[in-house]
Design a protein with these regions (language model features):
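Aromatic-rich carbohydrate-binding modules that target alpha-glucans
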Residues: 101-124, 216-225, 320-368, 380-413, ...
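Extended low-complexity, serine/threonine- and proline-enriched intrinsically disordered segments
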Residues: 74-102, 200-223, 331-342
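Bacterial Sec-dependent N-terminal signal peptides
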Residues: 1-27
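Low-complexity, Pro/Ser/Thr- and charge-rich linker/hinge segments at domain boundaries
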Residues: 29, 162-185, 397-424
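Basic K/R-rich, polyanion-interacting modules in nucleoproteins and related proteins
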Residues: 279-330, 422-434
């Protein structure tokens, strides 16, 4: 009788905890996003290598670091938690005590003040997992940061994954099946060996997600095995796991304000006591031949060649981008696009057309560092309430030979269980598999 009462009490507690969690989740999105204007330069990735993919090994010793700047300067009480999600980035329904070892919420305790910078800010950072918050299950996770522990105003959300490696993945880049995509797209085939798993029905219990350059916005989700061969699941769809190759990313180098990069044609302090810079004009690459060079695949790093440490000694530079065109795009707007925009088309990163110089112009506050980016277009008549879809066809072009990173995530949900595990993960570079 005592065991029955305990089981009922535990189930009731988990139900109530889950209901409270779902109610709180209605105020934010389960994707990478910053919800307030005064937080800038949100970085999240492996500690010491924050530009890399945010992945943890279950039971491993590594950690992820989240860092950001608050330009309102005063010290604030930021609180964070993590939410376990299913393969589709919906709440898994697990209560926090089922996947957290320690406290469900914790304050961000590490902060420092900027110095030697015209733009004042407070720099915050945290590492996860830590001694107060451990992780006990693999899967998709959402890191949520609140401002004010009582009101729980969500200010930052970031996706990350925890992997419990139980299978091996083999992948290769192949020529696209569709003739019209041979010179512009990239296709990836892969197979997994699930010998170590007690899989009853691989078609239902195993699925995969494929990402390009850490982008969740254009990922290919819910891939079931196409064929089975003994203990292997083969994901060879011949035309389904295909991505536009794009072009190598453009760059902005603001690492030094004393000895500016050659593409910085002007740099000075303006009348508002802000550091500002102007970049050399750029143009469309849609019809240009492919040019190969080393890039960061859309990511950025904060680095300062003049002062250290870069996290608090770097200034914000109001950077002007000038995109020359023969004619304005009648049905599209132009946007800065990349990791710096959280891979979203955002109003605050729109370039405006200036007929006097036949160019789109944008001015954006960027912390000193090294940035990769694209210019993307999006329909001007798009529904303002719906996520805008970026296109690179008019601005950047697309080539099959472009160097890109691909990430394969393998999910496993045994029959009768309550959550999706991640049991396999691999990063593939196009240059390494040709």
């Amino acid at each position: 009788m005592l065991h029955i009462r305990f089981a009922i009490t535990l189930q009731l507690f988990l139900f109530i905890s889950g209901a409270m969690l779902l109610q709180a989740q209605s105020t934010y999105m389960f994707t990478n996003n910053t919800y307030v204007d005064h937080l800038r330069t949100v970085n999240f990735g492996p500690t010491g290598f924050e530009h890399l993919f945010p992945m943890l090994e279950l039971g491993g010793s590594q950690s992820l670091t989240l860092s950001f700047d608050d330009v309102q300067s005063e010290v604030k009480n930021y609180v964070y938690t993590i939410i376990h999600c299913d393969r589709n980035w919906e709440p898994s329904g697990l209560a926090p005590l089922e996947y957290i070892d320690g406290f469900e919420e914790e304050n961000i305790q590490n902060f420092d003040f900027s110095f030697r910078a015209l733009q004042t800010y407070t720099h915050y950072d945290l590492q996860i997992p830590n001694r107060n918050m451990g992780i006990t299950k693999s899967g998709n996770y959402l890191l949520v940061v609140y401002e004010d522990e009582e009101e729980k105003q969500v200010v930052i959300t970031r996706r990350f994954i925890v992997v419990d490696r139980q299978i091996g993945i083999s992948a290769e880049m192949v020529r696209p099946v569709e003739v019209r995509k041979i010179h512009t797209h990239q296709e990836i085939d892969f197979d997994v060996n699930f010998l170590r798993l007690n899989v009853r029905n691989p078609m239902l219990e195993i699925s995969a997600t494929v990402l390009q350059n850490q982008r969740w916005d254009n990922g290919i989700y819910g891939l079931s095995p196409k064929f089975l061969n003994a203990d292997k699941a083969i994901f060879d769809y011949q035309g389904k796991v295909v991505f536009p190759g794009g072009s190598e990313f453009r760059l902005i180098d603001l690492r030094s304000l004393r000895i500016p990069h050659r593409d910085v044609v002007f740099i000075d302090v303006n009348m508002d006591n802000q550091m500002e810079a102007e970049l050399a004009p750029i143009a469309s690459r849609s019809k240009a031949p492919h040019l190969s060079f080393i890039d960061f695949n859309g990511r950025y790093v904060i680095e300062n060649q003049d002062n250290s440490p870069a996290e608090v000694a770097s200034d914000y530079v109001y950077t002007m981008i000038t995109y020359k065109v023969d004619q304005p795009y009648m049905d599209d707007h132009v946007y800065l696009f990349g990791d710096i925009t959280e891979w979203q088309v955002k109003d605050e990163y729109q370039l405006r057309y200036n007929p006097a110089i036949s160019a789109y112009v944008g001015r954006f506050p960027l912390k000193q560092g090294y940035y990769n980016y694209y210019l993307a277009t999006s329909p001007s008549d798009a529904d303002p309430k719906a996520p805008r879809v970026p296109s690179l066809l008019k601005t950047e072009g697309s080539h099959a030979d472009t160097e890109n990173d691909y990430y394969i995530l393998l999910y496993y949900r045994p029959f009768g269980t309550r959550y999706d595990q991640i049991v396999g993960y691999i990063q593939v570079n196009t240059l390494q598999t040709r």
